[in-house]
Amino acid sequence: MAGKRTQKINEGVDPTKLYALSLAIGMVKERAVAKFDETIEVSMNLGVDPRHADQMVRGVVNLPNGTGRTVRVAVFARGVKADEAKAAGADIVGAEDLVEIVQGGKIEFDRCIATPDMMPLVGRLGKVLGPRGMMPNPKVGTVTMDVAGAVKASKGGAVEFRVEKAGIVHAGIGKASFDAKALEENIRAFADAVIKAKPAGAKGNYVKRVAISSTMGPGVKIEVGSVTASPTA
């Protein structure tokens, strides 16, 4: 049954064809038929080799229409900054006590923020948070004195991205329940951020391929120009 269901979902998607962004979004939404609200993911193949330091691509983008998911945020801070984080809606706030919790393997959050003075302490968690992509970093705004702003951004649609070994960068940019216009705006915002993060060491064609998919659906390849160009309407 599962095989037949997959075959039916894949019908009408030509894996060798490149589709215009608006058409691709419609195709992906039509095929998101699971019993839950599937995440829509965009994947970009870049002409970089992240093994070289001058070809690393990473950054953060605030999606105009949010991600549609609940993001749990942990903040390492003390005193007034801890109070500000709590007031802004942080789910977990602490210092040494939070370090002990994380070291114990209890990671009940999706994003981690820290004030600069906390980094010597948070640095002990590199082996735990690093592999999960959660280590606070000033380059993506998660090491900051503006903890309230960082918490609100994280919960409001901020998405971190980092190129992987094969030169691929991807992210969930919304839900299948989003209307097509909202998804298109989010995809363009993500693509713009990746393009702006082009490293100095990148040579030749930077954006090689773009595709979108839903959690359970097939990947739909997109004409690169229809993603990187400004919409006409």
From Swiss-Prot:
Q: Domain of life of the organism in this record?
A: Bacteria
Gene3D superfamilies xref list: 3.30.190.20, 3.40.50.790
Instruction: Name the UniProt key words of this record, in alphabetical order.
Output: Repressor, Ribonucleoprotein, Ribosomal protein, RNA-binding, rRNA-binding, Translation regulation, tRNA-binding
Alphabetical list of InterPro entries matching this protein: Ribosom_uL1_bac-type, Ribosomal_uL1, Ribosomal_uL1-like, Ribosomal_uL1/biogenesis, Ribosomal_uL1_3-a/b-sand, Ribosomal_uL1_CS
* GO terms under biological process: regulation of translation; translation
Give the matching SUPFAM superfamilies: Ribosomal protein L1
Give the multimer and partner information. Part of the 50S ribosomal subunit.
Protein name stated in the entry: Large ribosomal subunit protein uL1
Natural source organism: Rhizobium leguminosarum bv. trifolii (strain WSM2304)
